[in-house]
């Protein structure tokens, strides 16, 4: 009996120890699983909070970037694809050659080089004149008090509500009449086109510069007047140096708008040798069954180069010029 009991006790002790070990292992496994689940839940909550706070902004930014870059990539692909159709450019950069650029400069009936020079001349002259005349007008409105000042500022804003497209017929008749007296300012002349552009650009740009001029303390003008400086000396010696950002912004915006303007330029410039890029490039796609979109895309790429170069050169002035010019002191 005692031997049996001893053997029974001897055999049950290891069984109890094994059960305890299995229970401990199970508890440890359950605890480990719970910790992992908590970590996973925490990660999910952290990602949800991040996406709700900032993540959606990144998603919107990526979508907007793709939406903006895709047309540029498509135009580049069409420019380097000599098939001449946009359908052949659906597979981006499937074919790369310079055939379109060669054809662009080898067509004597379509002088692309002359169009490029015309665009640069019209754009530079108009931008420079807009900056200079607009700065003088903004200085007068900002620093001088004269009869009709408020009415003049209000008129500048009201005139900008009517697009130049509504005045195309009037512009055509006006230049047609001027060409009978002063041919250099009439139809077919680049100088006449520059005058039309100046009339449309001075209003909004003058008001934009007027707001920036008001941020310059008038104490500088008063100190210069005490030293005997005139308005001309104050304007050229002091004010222009302090308002360089807004001058750069106005010049850049004017140049971009003029380089891409088509409607008025197509009405005023009738001679192919005097046309700008926007009007000249349209001839590549104007005729049905003979349009060449590849050459058109190549010309558009080259036309964008000066604008991009000017934008990069004046980039440091753009933000400060627009933000300060939008606040009227």
What are these regions (language model features)?
Residues 2-8, 15, 21-329:
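A hydrophobic, multi-pass inner-membrane permease signature
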């Amino acid at each position: 009996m005692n031997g049996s009991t001893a053997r029974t006790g001897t055999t049950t002790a290891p069984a109890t120890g094994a059960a305890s070990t299995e229970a401990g292992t199970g508890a440890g496994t359950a605890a480990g699983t719970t910790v992992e689940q908590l970590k996973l839940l925490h990660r999910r909550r952290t990602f949800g909070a991040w996406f709700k706070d900032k993540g959606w902004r990144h998603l919107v930014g990526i979508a907007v970037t793709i939406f903006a870059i895709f047309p540029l990539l498509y135009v580049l692909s069409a420019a380097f694809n000599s098939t001449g159709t946009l359908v052949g450019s659906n597979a981006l950069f499937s074919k790369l050659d310079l055939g379109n650029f060669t054809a662009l400069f080898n067509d004597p009936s379509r002088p692309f080089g002359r169009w490029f020079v015309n665009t640069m001349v019209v754009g530079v002259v108009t931008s420079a004149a807009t900056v200079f005349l607009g700065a003088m007008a903004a200085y007068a409105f900002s620093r001088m008090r004269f009869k009709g000042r408020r009415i003049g500022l209000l008129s500048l804003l009201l005139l900008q509500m009517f697009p130049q497209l509504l005045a195309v017929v009037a512009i055509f008749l006006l230049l047609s009449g001027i060409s009978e007296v002063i041919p250099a300012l009439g139809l077919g002349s680049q100088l006449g086109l520059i005058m039309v552009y100046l009339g449309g650009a001075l209003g909004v740009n003058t008001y934009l510069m007027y707001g920036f001029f008001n941020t310059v303390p008038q104490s500088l003008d008063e100190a210069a007047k005490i030293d005997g400086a005139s308005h001309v000396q104050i304007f050229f010696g002091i004010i222009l140096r302090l308002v360089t950002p807004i001058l750069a912004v106005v010049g850049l915006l004017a140049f971009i708008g003029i380089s891409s303007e088509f409607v008025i330029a197509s009405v005023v410039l009738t001679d192919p040798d005097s046309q700008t890029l926007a009007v000249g490039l349209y001839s590549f796609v104007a005729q049905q069954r003979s349009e060449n979109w590849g050459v058109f895309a190549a010309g558009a790429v080259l036309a964008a180069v000066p604008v991009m170069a000017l934008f990069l050169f004046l980039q440091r002035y753009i933000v400060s010029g627009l933000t300060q010019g939008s606040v009227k002191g």
